[in-house]
């Protein structure tokens, strides 16, 4: 087996200027500035084992675990839309296991079992602070945000959990050195859970659950 640990830090600065030469578009010129800090940490672990007690039996096992921590902070300023602070975080992980078993009953009958189990968890987090409220008045109204705050501090959280098992059984009956019969039986069991939440931080530090006015609140 092996283990891998990696870490990276990236800083990005970008300045843009947009000028619209056709006044009939009625679109104002825009200057934007953005500063982005990205952090990423990754851990990877793989272990494998093989067991052969005799010439008729063989067992192979492998497990691969992966854990990631990601964080991105962006400070964005627009001469048209104002200032926005955005923070994105995620700590996804996955565990993948493989099991293979081979059994030779005799010269004419061979069995093989293969199974794979995967667990995956994802939890993306997004937070945006919109300092110039007037530029987002229509959007805030549609989302049902509380307008009496100093700014719009909104959060979206998601939770995605996946659990899947794949397994199959193979049987070979040897008829001759050049021909055989093969029968395969397999199954896939899969389950996924999804949850999402959207809310607003108020100036007092409390949490407000808005009711959107679009799509009848859904």
Model-derived regions, located:
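Primarily recognizes Gram-negative and organellar outer-membrane beta-barrels
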Residues: 1-218
